[in-house]
């Protein structure tokens, strides 16, 4: 399907359910209804998996992108009685930056976006409406119950695969210090949020969001970045990228738009997103001053924070750790400061020779965050942009500052996670995790990869997924995906899918290594289907059924090939699984155990060996000519 390029194309976003799948729901209390995806196997089994796609893969759901998604949380928010609606700030043309367009198409999108926007809501005077604030007061919110049900999933189908005590003991994970429960309870979720070890990013102005948790003691999550640039992409294309990203497994999405119509793009994305949305507010603030970093002011930035909080952004990347005293530490780096936000603020600090205004106004930022329940994603503006800059003084000086700011945020009960690198060779990854836990008090870590090598342009999603799997196992709570276009250009729809699949692999590998309950059951179901040559089930249990089916059908396209007990790799005579099945069939026919059958085979082979030796051990036996 081509990316949409007209307003009406927003009515036909990607809606197809996955093959052999349907949306199912686990019910809780107070209207808690958690969606999951059920995969029907050809042997009658039902496998249920975590689902990030929202209502888009539910054929029974009615979706009109011009109206936005239905609310999940409005009733919960209103029932708490600690918020109020208000008129909100007046939208101005500058909100869409200095490069906004005035074409008829954009004006139509902008007008429709104005209708999309809900009446903003905020905490009542002097109030605090964060999930951390509730958690620290012993309140279990519906959002926390939702998370517990979602993390558990439906486990009945797993019993067949997890019942072998010897196997489970042999394959037990190493949690690397994490404390992962066998069963998630709402009380466990509350305690993790209260301690700051987990966050539930859920702005009160984003009632459409399906609550999820980011934390070391939960399943490893992934984030996908979308957003336009000054040179490419449209609003319609970015909304389709959002839907496409969550289809393939993005738990969160960041809108990193830096080009035209930033405000309008964000309206469309937030209102149509069932997953938390993050932004980097400094990008829009920079657009408001015409792209001149030194013209940024606290007043402009503060106004931008409120604007985005009213729209419903769930977490802000804020580069408050890029401090004036640290900038000189980057002077001898091979690649300097590679973070866009970090470089903007470094330039501002050097130009004015003043401390970063995000650092000096941090407590004021906390006041805004707690009025809307926007979570901090404390940005790593001094992250290494190459392997040779990894783990240097600048990176770790900033990390220590982020730990200090975390405690300030927690003083205000503001949920906080910490962003991390970047480019880190494999042997230095553990040190990154150790330093983060040490200085940031177990706040969730959120890393970009890291990329383990620098020589893979076009394949950086692979180079980084290696590092992502490692650091996910070590304790990182969320992995920010990298696409094949990293360092090369703005990713398109296919790049987004490739990046997400690479990172779903990394996150799942980390969950298995950590011993996350039930993580391996889907793999066992796949292995069983593979051994039994149930080709359709193999496709449908995979992370990407479409590609798996296409690859198989390139060489064996006929329907009859889906029943064959071989593939094109080995053919019918050399398939190891077919040979093993033949041994088992022989054993069953003879009334033997599999071990006895193998012993029979070995005995027969020994007899043939003895016969060969008795004949002289010659490979070629002379043949006496027949006399005429």
Swiss-Prot record:
Gene3D superfamilies xref list: 6.10.250.620, Radical SAM ThiC family, central domain (3.20.20.540)
Broadest EC class assigned to this enzyme: lyase
GO molecular function: 4 iron, 4 sulfur cluster binding; carbon-carbon lyase activity; zinc ion binding
Names of required cofactors: [4Fe-4S] cluster
GO cellular component: cytosol
UniProt: substrate binding residues: 225, 254, 283, 319, 339-341, 380-383, 419, 446
Pathway assignment: Cofactor biosynthesis; thiamine diphosphate biosynthesis
Superkingdom of source: Bacteria
Family: Belongs to the ThiC family.
Keywords: 4Fe-4S, Iron, Iron-sulfur, Lyase, Metal-binding, S-adenosyl-L-methionine, Thiamine biosynthesis, Zinc
Binding site for [4Fe-4S] cluster: 567, 570, 575
Catalytic reactions on record: 5-amino-1-(5-phospho-beta-D-ribosyl)imidazole + S-adenosyl-L-methionine = 4-amino-2-methyl-5-(phosphooxymethyl)pyrimidine + CO + 5'-deoxyadenosine + formate + L-methionine + 3 H(+)
Gene responsible for this protein: thiC
Biological role: Catalyzes the synthesis of the hydroxymethylpyrimidine phosphate (HMP-P) moiety of thiamine from aminoimidazole ribotide (AIR) in a radical S-adenosyl-L-methionine (SAM)-dependent reaction.
Biological processes annotated in GO: thiamine biosynthetic process; thiamine diphosphate biosynthetic process
NCBIfam families linked to this entry: PRK09284.1 (NF006763), PRK13352.1 (NF009895), thiC (TIGR00190)
EC number(s) per entry: 4.1.99.17
Protein name per Swiss-Prot or TrEMBL: Phosphomethylpyrimidine synthase
Cofactor stoichiometry and binding remark: Binds 1 [4Fe-4S] cluster per subunit. The cluster is coordinated with 3 cysteines and an exchangeable S-adenosyl-L-methionine.
Organism this protein belongs to: Leptothrix cholodnii (strain ATCC 51168 / LMG 8142 / SP-6) (Leptothrix discophora (strain SP-6))
Residues noted as binding Zn(2+) in the record, renumbered to the chain: 423, 487
HAMAP family according to UniProt: ThiC
Quaternary structure (record): Homodimer.
